[in-house]
Every structure is written in C-alpha cells, then in structure tokens.
Amino acid sequence: AIHGFYPAYWIEIHHEWVQPFNYLVQQNINTFFYKYDWNDCPSNVSNDFKEELKFLINTNPNITNWQIVGHSMGGSVVMFTNQSFDFNNKITFNTVATPVNYVREKTSFLIRTYEFLFRKNCKENINSLDYEFENGFINKHVQWRNLKEFDSQFKNYNFDPYDGHIKDSIIF
C-alpha cells in the first residue's frame, strides 16, 4: 500500500483508506506499507518502489496474489511502477482516488504555490502515461474512483480529474 500526498498546509489528514487496510490486517492478509518522501516526484519514487516490490515478490514466493494499492498520489506511483514493471500474472495494480487527468493551471493556488516553493516541478506527471492510457498497462490495473463531490481534494478542482480512459482498466 502506498499513501497519498499530505502537504504541511493541510489542516486535517484524510484517512479514507485506513479502514479497509485495517480490515485486511485483521483478516491476516499480508499487508505491506511503503513509505516515501511525498515531496519527490511519483515517477522517481516508482523506481525505488519497483525494486522493493521485486524484492518482496522474490522473498515471498508462496504469495500467489499481489494486490498493489496506491491512494491518490500513491496511485500515480503505482501507475508509473506498472509502466515499467515486467509482466507478472500474480499482480494487480490498484489505484484509489487517483486522477487520470491533470490540468495544473486549473489546480488551486495553494497547490501551485507549494509546487513553486518546494521546486516540485516534475518532468513527468499523469499526462506522461498517454501511451499506457491508450494501449493499456502491462499488468492488470483496477481504478477505484471516488465521487468527485465527496473527495477532499478533487471537489475543489474546476476540472474533472477522472476525465480520462485507460484501455483494459477495470473501473469501480
């Protein structure tokens, strides 16, 4: 599981994904959490995560079903990982509340200010996955989309972050 982005200026942290993961743990389902520096670009983080995932798979050969879950920006990390990960029929990459459309100019002033102050200008963003969106990812991909009006961030955008299609991706 890979968490989303929680910048310092957010007053409260939204834990909508915590309860489902608590359930997995209570059911004795192996659950691994990956912590990363959310000030780094998702495409950069995905390189390290890919190596960690390969290590986990190799050291746990008895696990036959891997559900990789990324929430929000963590979902972007998951998609960049899937972009470069070798085919493995044991893996499903899941993205939860992850945009498939990003229009930086239409994001809030706070987001743009944060990006400027921390020089977080990633050369690759969600729009860098156009090839995968058009042709599909190598491994299975499932999208768990929030309703925009209930999502703590997306409801503030004046564009639809889900206005995009990923070939062969399952959408819930």
Predicted region positions:
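Active-site loop/turn elements of alpha/beta-hydrolase fold enzymes
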Residues: 4, 34-38, 98, 146
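Serine-esterase "nucleophile elbow" of acetyl-processing enzymes
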Residues: 9-27
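Hydrophobic/aromatic beta-strand patches that form the interior of the parallel beta-sheet core
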Residues: 32, 94, 142-145
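Serine-dependent carboxylesterase/thioesterase catalytic core
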Residues: 2-4, 11-15, 43-139
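Conserved alpha/beta-hydrolase
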Residues: 22-40
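C-terminal catalytic-base region of ester-bond hydrolases, centering on the histidine
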Residues: 127-172
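Short, intrinsically disordered, charge-balanced linker/junction segments flanking boundaries
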Residues: 1, 6, 169-171
